[in-house]
A protein has these predicted regions:
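Phosphate/NTP-binding elements of NTP-utilizing enzymes
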Residues: 1-219
Length: 219
């Protein structure tokens, strides 16, 4: 949540946790309001997120979800996840099916050190690098066109048509893509600072530093 604050999303103004948004905020109603707001993150645009815990069985069985955000994946029970939560990622195709992220997943974690916690590493073999490269190429082209428009203050008919084509291509490719990447904390050096990396190397056990900070698989 501190990152949301840093990015300009403030609690009580842009999102709330565990309570129904008061009408005085003027936020739109969710398409499907939750029956219980206790485990709900609500946003100022009317969207909501449901916080799911694996402490109890069946907490996601009755849900119809549009997207999954799985944090600290190395601590997740994969058997419970695939039996309960994956099947719940099924809702509202008629409403949001045109969006390429619909029914997608974001999985983030430190590098696991146990076999049980390594379930998500298997996605690496399903990452089609040629598809990812094609997406990257289109993104670069889109950026270049938009940058030229910004610099010149003029948008040609070709640029307008090409941006539309790129948008359609990207939506189609992204809807089929699985992106897998392992990043060390060095990639986030502008936020963390080099002193943090040095301190972690000094203070953490070697295995913890290699897996949690440098994102290296245990040998």
């Amino acid at each position: 949540l501190q990152h949301w604050e840093r990015w300009g999303f403030h609690r009580g103004k842009h999102y709330l946790i565990g309570i129904k948004p008061p009408k005085k905020l003027g936020w739109p109603e969710p398409v499907i309001p939750p029956s219980n707001w206790e485990n709900t993150i609500s946003f100022y645009n009317g969207s909501i997120g449901t916080i799911i815990s694996q402490d109890r069985k069946g907490t996601s069985n009755s849900l119809s979800l549009d997207y999954l955000d799985i944090d600290e994946a190395k601590f997740i029970n994969f058997e419970q996840l695939k039996d309960e939560t994956f099947p719940a990622n099924r809702g509202n195709v008629n409403l949001f099916g045109r969006h390429y992220y619909h029914h997608g997943m974001l999985i983030t974690s430190d590098m696991p050190v146990t076999k049980k916690g390594s379930w998500f590493l298997n996605y690496k073999k399903d990452c089609d690098q040629q598809l990812i490269d094609a997406i990257s190429s289109l993104v670069v082209e889109e950026y270049d066109i938009r940058n030229r428009i910004k610099t010149s203050g003029h948008i040609s008919l070709y640029a307008k048509r090409r941006l539309k084509e790129i948008g359609l291509h990207l939506a189609q490719l992204r809807s089929k893509a699985l992106f897998y990447k392992e990043y060390s904390s060095v990639y986030n050096i502008e936020v963390l600072g080099m002193d943090f990396i040095k301190q972690m190397k000094r203070d953490l056990p070697a295995l913890t530093f290699q897996t949690s900070i440098m994102c290296k698989r245990p040998s």
